[in-house]
Amino acid sequence: MTMPRGRVHMPRCAIAGVEATVAETAHAFPRHSHDRFGIGVILSGGHRSASGRGLVEARANDAIMVNPGEVHDGSPLDERGRTWRMLYFEPSMFVTAASELTGAAARELELTQPVAHDPLLKRLFERLFSVAVEVPFVPDDLAREEALLELLGHLVRVHATRPIRSSSTDALGPIAQAKARIDDDPSSALTLADLAADAGMSRFQLLRGFAHEMGLPPHAYRMQRRVVLARQWIARGATLADAAAAAGFADQSHMTRAFVRLLGVTPANYAAALR
């Protein structure tokens, strides 16, 4: 698959619950997170990313991985940029694969390495990408299912572990309550004063505490959740203008800027990938 330099594209994927991205760009992505597991391979150039796991660098033929909700950024190692392919999986797909492999319920998993030099993982990824994204060449559901399970199985066996909870989550802390209020309605015109009142702290305490626990300040987190909400509306068939309004953006241009900044693609490209 060829594409113009300096572009991020979301091609159509033939597997339900999986989204694909192809990129050749020097774009620096701000801190953000995804609501899916992301697996990819660097094809050329180099990529640098910082997350809660530290600063990592990936080069050609390296695999890159990210967990749902894991805040990270991304920039090229030099002005030449980098080229990569990614597949983003609904979390339930990993849970199902882990349960089938172990024979036990597996509610939570996380990928342990942001970057890995794993030739087998690279080959399994490339096989799945070829049959899931380059559909006209392999229109075979069985081949896609086999490739999907082989990749997920390898990731679960070699690169995943169940996370250790540091504390009980029976009762939400004040920052978690503020996050939950944004999650409940990202389109709402909330203020810091609203969130601080819910959390029982000052606006300054809320701002510092939210950024510390979530890795993003409240406004950036809400913008990210609005992009997720807009994607959901687009997936349901809403027009771009209606999706922008429903997600709380000022207008369609506002939504487009947020998409490009966080995802590198326009809402129109995302909509086309779903058709």
PLM regions: where:
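Short, charged, intrinsically disordered terminal tails
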Residues: T161-R162, A272-R275
